[in-house]
């Protein structure tokens, strides 16, 4: 899978080139165009229903994601961010994770797991108790 980020720094667009039978997963509503040989399938975000609902409610992420797969020959699909702005890549290593701002996820390979962290709730609970 190859990708290019075009039109930086504002109005950035992520263009992904897929080999036959290669798949990229993306946030619902992020796709701007795809070639005719790219098939799209929609699924719930997480394997568990509670995980999907948690991401949707607390992470302000869509309940669904889309999987884009090139059929029979190479294909191209492009994505943009929800609030218009720049796009950056985060290269992941095994057992490494990132905490990113809600609504900033656009796309990833299929082996990336998305989860939520309770930072906002923890801060609020701690400030109500006057933690120091």
Model-derived segments and spans:
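Composition-driven recognition of glycine/serine/threonine/acidic- and proline-rich low-complexity segments
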Residues: 1-132
């Amino acid at each position: 899978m190859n990708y290019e980020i075009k039109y930086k720094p504002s109005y950035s667009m992520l263009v992904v080139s897929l080999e036959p039978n290669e798949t990229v997963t993306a946030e619902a509503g992020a796709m701007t165009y795809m070639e005719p040989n790219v098939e799209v399938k929609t699924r719930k975000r997480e394997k568990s229903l509670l995980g999907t609902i948690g991401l949707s409610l607390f992470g302000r992420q869509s309940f669904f994601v889309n999987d884009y797969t090139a059929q029979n020959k190479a294909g191209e699909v492009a994505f943009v961010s929800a609030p218009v702005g720049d796009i950056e890549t985060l290269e992941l290593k095994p057992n490494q994770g990132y905490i990113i701002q809600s609504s900033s996820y656009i796309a990833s390979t299929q082996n990336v797991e998305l989860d939520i962290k309770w930072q906002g709730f923890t801060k609020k609970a701690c400030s109500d108790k006057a933690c120091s």
